[in-house]
Regions:
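Short, small-residue alpha-helix embedded
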Residues: 53-84
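Glycine-rich phosphate/dinucleotide-binding loop and adjoining beta-alpha-beta core of small-molecule
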Residues: 1-46, 118-126
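Charged C-terminal helix
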Residues: 87-126
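Active-site proximal loops enriched in glycine and acidic residues that flank catalytic Cys/His/Asp
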Residues: 28-30, 37, 45-46, 55-57, ...
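Short, well-structured alpha-helical segments that form the helix of a local strand-helix-strand
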Residues: 11-20, 74-87, 102-110
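Short acidic (Asp/Glu) and glycine-rich catalytic loops that position anionic groups and cofactors
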Residues: 43-45, 61, 85-89
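Glycine-rich phosphate/pyrophosphate-binding beta-alpha loops
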Residues: 49-51
Length: 126
């Protein structure tokens, strides 16, 4: 309701201010991840409570790093990394329930790509 919208607006505003102040992209994890470069923002609602375990933030960082290495600009890379990691976590939860390990999320990353980008081939290092 209205309270949720008000709280989200405050949260987004605070994160955007911090991003501008630091001159960097920020991803604030939560039920809805907030991703911003200070000028624009996205909310990502993928993922589930089973992902609140050690190592999933490391997985998220690695996926974002992969998108950065593929020459995506930082805001887009962070949005894509958040989405893919969240979808992978949702797929893992369908298979295993909410008692997940970070490796369950990792194992589901190829399926997350296949679901939204069928036939996608990962860029290989040159």
């Amino acid at each position: 309701g209205a309270d949720f919208e008000r709280l989200m607006a405050v949260r987004v505003n605070d994160v955007m201010k911090a991003s501008l102040r630091l001159g960097s992209v920020i991803l604030l994890k939560g039920k809805y991840d907030v991703i911003t470069d200070g000028k624009r923002y996205k909310l990502d609602g993928t993922g589930n409570p089973g992902m609140a375990v050690g190592g999933v933030g490391d997985v998220l960082s690695g996926v974002i790093g992969a998108f950065l290495s593929w020459k995506n600009e930082p805001f887009r890379a962070t949005c894509a990394g958040s989405f893919v990691t969240g979808v992978a976590g949702d797929i893992a939860a369908l298979r295993k329930g909410y008692h997940l390990l970070a490796t369950d999320v990792i194992d589901s990353i190829p399926d997350a790509f296949s679901k939204y980008w069928p036939g996608y081939r990962f860029p290989l290092p040159s």
